Structure formats: C-alpha cells, structure tokens
C-alpha cells in the first residue's frame, strides 16, 4: 500500500507539468501548420516534404516516460554519484589530458564506468544527450567553450544516450542545420556510431571524453536524463544537478558554478601560459 501511495503521489505531481507540455506541443504544431499553409499558398519550394506533428500518441508516451525517469532517478544532489556502465567512444590522440588520472588507460570501445573518468582533485562535468535532440545539439558550441576555458581545472565527459527523436519514432521536422536523421538504436554499435556522427558534426576539444550509454540505458535511468541533463561530480558526490531537459537544461548554470569555484585558478593558469 505504501508503494502504491508513493506511485499515486508521483503521478499527481507529474500530471500538471505533463499537461503543460502537451499544451506546448499543441501550440508548436499550430504554429508549424500555419507556417506550412502560408508557404503552400505562396507556392514556395519550402513546402516540399512531409509535415510532422509533435503531438502524437508516441510523443505523449515519450514525454510521460521522461517525467517518470526524472521522478524515479537515483541521482540526488549532495549524494553519491551513480557509477553507471558506459562504452568509451572517443579517442584523445594528440590531446592534453594532464590531470585526468585513470582516463588515459581507457581504450576506445572498451566497457567502463562513468566514475572512471573522475579525478579526486578535479570536478567532472557530465553532459547527457543525443544527436536528435535540438536543445542539446544547439548548446554544444557553448559546451565546447566550457571545455576550452575550464579544462585546466575540471574534466569533461559527454554521455551519448538513447535518441530523443529517432527518425523511425517520435521524429521532428528536419529543417535546421542542427538536425540529424538517426534511427532507434538496435545494438551498442548503432549507439556508438550515432555518437561518432555527432562528433563529426560538432568537433569537441580532446580534453572532453565521449562515452555511450549501454543498451539497458542504465546511465539514462540512474540520472533521470530522458532527453538531456548536465551534472557535476566532485569527490564521487553530486556537487551540481541540472534540471530536466529540454526546458531546464542550462549550461549557463554550469559556467556560474565553475566560475564561482575555480575562476581564480583559471586566471593563474592563463597568466602562467
């Protein structure tokens, strides 16, 4: 009965924000439909292609699942960071990995754990997302700047998770330079290949390691990611926990945290360089 009460309470907490997300998707579809009609009336070539709605049954299931993942996540601010199993994707040949500890021993394609990339002396910024999530890919240039500016005092890890909007699932219109056409991952090779595709489009500094979540989505579940999320691990604890994406995904908060804790050390490093 206690478990049922908890589940009911969580459901009641989720419902208001779930319906607000449904309203947002309905408004988004209305705007896109209006734009499509205007272009059609003007006989523009831009109307070619399929118009995809966001408010679909599959879309609603994905949104609901994302709130459940957030509600039942293992990660808590100030508590131990979940040591999820991941697969190493990126190589750091030619990169400067000084101070990264055991990270240098992890071979590309090897199965490892998230905290293998953490160092006792330095915070680890962990960025979760996928190529088919526009809010995530649109912030990759800002994430790259964070790596470039703070790699002297912090380590960075990008965790590639399940696709947010696979082309054979809850797809979104591919009308921007940030859009990707990636199908649902059928195996670990598919997920790692998608991560490599992302790296080919958005080059990240060698100081940032890239891994892929396992096919059981253990990192996604433990950190309640769903679409995207960012956190900071320090001494095996969660020092900063970002909000649930896409609306609460905020790299600016990460910048503020790093500046607050390490701005003086960064300045000394730049002067020494």
Swiss-Prot record:
Transmembrane segments: 10-34
All ranges on the Lumenal side of the membrane: 1-9
Any Gene Ontology CC annotation: endoplasmic reticulum membrane
Topology with respect to the bilayer: Single-pass type III membrane protein
Localization per record: Endoplasmic reticulum membrane
Pfam families according to UniProt: T4_deiodinase
Family assignment from sequence similarity: Belongs to the iodothyronine deiodinase family.
Protein name from the UniProt record: Type II iodothyronine deiodinase
Gene that encodes it: DIO2
């Amino acid at each position: 009965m206690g478990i049922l009460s908890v589940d009911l309470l969580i459901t009641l907490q989720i419902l208001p924000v779930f319906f607000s997300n449904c309203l947002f998707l309905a408004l988004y579809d209305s705007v896109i439909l209006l734009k499509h009609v205007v272009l059609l009336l003007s006989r523009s070539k831009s109307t070619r292609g399929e118009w995809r709605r966001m408010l679909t049954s599959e879309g609603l299931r994905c949104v609901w699942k994302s709130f459940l993942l957030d509600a039942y996540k293992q990660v808590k601010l100030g508590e131990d960071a979940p040591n999820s199993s991941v697969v190493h994707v990126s190589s750091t040949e030619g990169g400067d990995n000084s101070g990264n500890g055991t990270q240098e021993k992890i071979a590309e394609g090897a199965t490892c754990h998230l905290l293998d990339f953490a160092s006792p002396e330095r915070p680890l910024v962990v960025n979760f997302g996928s190529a088919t999530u526009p809010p995530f890919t649109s912030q990759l240039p800002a994430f790259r700047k964070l790596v470039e500016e703070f790699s002297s005092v912090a380590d960075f890890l990008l965790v590639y998770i399940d696709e947010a909007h696979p082309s054979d699932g809850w797809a979104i219109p591919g009308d921007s330079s940030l859009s990707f056409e990636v199908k649902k991952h059928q195996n670990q090779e598919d997920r790692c290949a998608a991560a490599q595709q992302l790296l080919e489009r958005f080059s990240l500094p060698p100081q940032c390691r890239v891994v892929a979540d396992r096919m059981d989505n253990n990192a996604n579940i433990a950190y309640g990611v769903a679409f995207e999320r960012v956190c900071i691990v320090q001494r095996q604890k969660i020092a900063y926990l970002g909000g649930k994406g896409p609306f609460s995904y905020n790299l600016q908060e990460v910048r503020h945290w790093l500046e607050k804790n390490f701005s003086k050390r960064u300045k000394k490093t730049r002067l020494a360089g």
